[in-house]
Amino acid sequence: RTCQSQSHKFKGACFSDTNCASVCRTENFPRGQCNQHHVERKCYCERDC
């Protein structure tokens, strides 16, 4: 199962999964990707749980 948490450090709209994943790694998550959240794209960090 995968758990997602919105990144606390990522600022602004998320257009690059690579940038999102890099920020997530600084938050101790192994990966991250952009997901649509209402009208904005946000960076969500993922880990196995």
Swiss-Prot record:
InterPro entries the UniProt entry points to: Defensin_plant (IPR008176), Scorpion_toxin-like (IPR003614), Scorpion_toxin-like_sf (IPR036574)
PROSITE patterns membership: GAMMA_THIONIN
Keywords attached to this entry: Antimicrobial, Disulfide bond, Fungicide, Plant defense
Cystine bridges: 3-49, 14-34, 20-43, 24-45
GO biological process, any: killing of cells of another organism
Superkingdom of the organism of origin: Eukaryota
Function summary: Plant defense peptide.
Family the UniProt entry places it in: Belongs to the DEFL family.
Protein name, UniProt field: Defensin Tm-AMP-D1.2
Source species: Triticum monococcum (Einkorn wheat)
Source taxonomy: Eukaryota, Viridiplantae, Streptophyta, Embryophyta, Tracheophyta
